[in-house]
Amino acid sequence: MLLTLTAVARAQDAATGAVAGRVTDASGAAVAGVKVKATRTATGAVRETTTDADGTHVLTSLVPGEYRIEFEAAGFNPRALDHGLVQVGARLTVDAVLDVQGRAETIEVSEPGVSVPTGNGLVGGVVGAGVVENLPLNGRNFLELAFLLPGNAPAPNFDPTKTNVVAISSAGQLGRGGNITIDGQDNNDDVVGGPLANLPQDAVQEFQMATNRFSAEQGRSAASAVNVVTRSGGDTLAGSLSVFVRDDALQGLPATFDRTQEAPPFSRQQYSATLGGPIARGRAWWFAAAEYRNQDSVVQTGTRDVAARTIRQSLAAAPLNDFLGMARIDVRATDQDTLGFRYLVQDEDDVAASTLDRSIGSATQRQSSDNRHQQGLATWTRVLGTTSVNTLRASYSNFRNVIDPVAPGRQLTFPSIQDGASFRVPQGTTQTRWQFSDSLSWVKGAHSLRVGAEYSHTYGRFDLGVFREGRVELVQDFAQFDLNRDGRVDDDDLLFAVTLRSGKPDQNLLLDDCSSSYISGFVQDDWRVTPQLTLNVGLRYELDSDVKNISGYADTNPIVQAFYQGDRGRDLDNFGPRLGFAWTNRRGMLQLHGGFGLYYDRVTLEIISLERGLDGRALPIEVRAGNVFFLDPGTGSVPPFAPTFADPFTGFILPGAGASGINIIDNSLENPTVQQYNLGARYRLPGDAVLQLDLVHNRGTHFIIGRTVGEVFNPVVGGPDRVVNLESSVGTRYDALLTSLEKRFGRGQQLRVSYSLARARNYANDDQIPFSSGPIDPNDLEREYGPTPNEQRHRLVLSGSFLLPLELRLSGIWTIASAVPMDILMPDASHRVPTLSRNVGAREFENAAELNAYLTSLNAKGGIDGVPLPLVREDARFSDSFDSLDLRLSRRFALTSSLSLEAIVECFNVFNVTNVLGVSKTNYSGFANVLARDSSDPADAGFLRSSSFGRALTTAGGVFGSGGPRAFQLGLRAQF
């Protein structure tokens, strides 16, 4: 007997897998009518089918897990395979060769290796429960598993609600997009983008990441699709209890921290528990998991040392409490019907840094967040016959976020640091979603077909206290002159250009019912043309009902009606064809694959909030002149009636000067679209390791940017106001070689190597919401084309788990990446140097000498608007590479036949490499990127010198995160 095992990602339900293959006799002839039975080991649930005339068998919509697969046919020996592993979003191919009747035979597969797949050319991978359990994930967040696979990296922070969230940047996109599902349920933030809820790490059964070219069954993403399946109970009562601890005695400090300051204490404790078992053996099962994290952490901040005229790196307290819970019940109601019910809850509060417009913020720029999330899911799977299965899902989710400043006050935006309280808070958002989906899969001859549809309605609500306390735009980090003639030079002598404050400072901006419905349908056919060649053909349609604010269009400001062109309607032509091929040689050693797909990204409801909120009426911004306008160049002083640093909002109004303007949604705005192409190969190496290489080319169109298109007189502000058009007029490009090597051994041992060689380009440091910045020249958007802020040309990740002598297990993750680029900003940090493209640091300029040569040439031509720019230090840096090795050493002790205790020691960043990196989209490099002058006096030599530029400000991961200073963590896990 011969059984060939293969695992392959293909067109499967987002929460299930499949078993398929071909049965032949000893001569190679197909055997029809073979009864194929798959029995799930944990529960005894059975699915059956028979082979067709070609000997082909397919069982779809299987719950991921371990199965016994049996073959029975008249005149042949019965055969069976034990421990066949069905993975999420993947097909386990079992090809069997039957011989004439004799003794029965069972093939024991304790842990299948990785084989060359057949049937699909998807770019991605699956991370199983054993990997999730053994690898040292620094934050114990399931989304960190995405970084083990090529083409994925952390994304910059893009919104105050996401300061403690793992956001994934896939295939060059920046984190707002992507599609994350848990058990097939949408887990995405439709309000601002990015992921929504976390779940206990020990509740994850499997994690699948489709980085590129996924099937028509999955959509609403122009980047990647993440499918997570939670664990379920079995016929045996089983559970675990874990604790992980670390504190400042086991933890280093960031290299940028000023050691002359006292470091606040910090610690973290994480507790996790699981328990599951039968309600009625063979019929119903339950499972529950809970995790609690109590963290007294710190965040990296800056402190203005006025006496020393420098900005010192410091730390500020950032406590966090996070409870995660999950419970599910699975019922085998009949032999054909399976019901599933799952509930998730997250209750989290934290203090963290707010979203920054500068490279670093002060301690007062922290914010206090309160997040509540819950979701429920019901699933009904019905086996309609030996070749067809239908799955119906209904779900509800609710998310509420409230953010307040740690202390009220105005925002002080210095060129090099953001001080005071963030102007973005207080704020709160609410999202409620109802979702319904149905999918039908059936096998007809050589065709494996799936067809389905989805409907969801998302209600969004914004409660925004933005600009209530105001914002002061300063032009220098420290005062240079005694402006007020009081005999000393201090902060009362600081120069500031403008102030911005809400014209209604006593009330929040409330935007209710920012809602939209989503409708989609798909058909997918995986056609096995020959035993070696499969064609993947699919078509998906998607529609968002109201992301263009159709329901609020009649209420837009009449003074901007002339700027709307044409009629506003829904984007109705979002058809996404998918076409691919996969060819495998007869020996099953080599697969060639490739294809094309058209993918549409979601448009977040924040777009609606911009048109409704920044309409020139709902949130009027008073822009007033700063004391710069009152400066007497002859005396170097300001008159007594000028606005002061202590009382800055007394200047005369400058209508339209620096405010966000009136935002309008272009009537032709469309969903961002990406054309994805790939061509690749998989090859089985000696020792059953599999090497995969994919050439990927993605071209994005219709991405959103805000462009100033004119001015109108706004009676609310008493003068002209600029009009900003939110339009689908820019694109993206991503070209990459994605490589992976995977090998599985017995007893949970495995090795994975992932490498990405990539180039990512776009037109903005935020690829959806152009709120805080716009193009240098609104009539020449090509000047905005440049690297994404988190582009890493090279990224290598090695992960694995191995058994050592003395029954020790060593597991690790080693991440090495090249430097990200850096924007180079003007001395007042208002925008980048206008003669430069975006993010040219560490790209066009490799070192300070090259930048200084450019600046010298620019100054010789008159500088910017006749003012020369300062040169930087010879040792100034733009960016830093990344290198972090995380290890776990553990040993399991068997206390009884069913109870074990595992002792765990983890070390993160073993070699204590300093990895300078930022968090904000404004400056992700972590180095000071403002050409801040040493002196604001044109007669002083410091006017043409910027000593602070290129200085390291923040390190990757802060204190606790990945790539941060070396840290040890101790753990203990009991299992039964």
Language-model segments: which ranges?
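A beta-strand signature from Gram-negative outer-membrane beta-barrel systems
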Residues: 96, 148-151, 187, 201-244, ...
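Periplasm-facing N-terminal accessory domains of Gram-negative outer-membrane beta-barrel systems
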Residues: 2-128, 186, 200-202
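Extracytoplasmic gating/loop element in the C-terminal half of outer-membrane beta-barrel translocons
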Residues: 639, 643-652, 660, 807-898, ...
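Extracytoplasmic beta-strand/coil segments of soluble accessory domains associated
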Residues: 133-189, 221-231
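Gram-negative outer-membrane beta-barrel transporters
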Residues: 692-823
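Solvent-exposed loop/turn elements at secondary-structure boundaries
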Residues: 142, 155, 549-576, 580-725, ...
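Transmembrane beta-barrel wall of Gram-negative outer-membrane proteins
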Residues: 238, 264-349, 368-396, 577
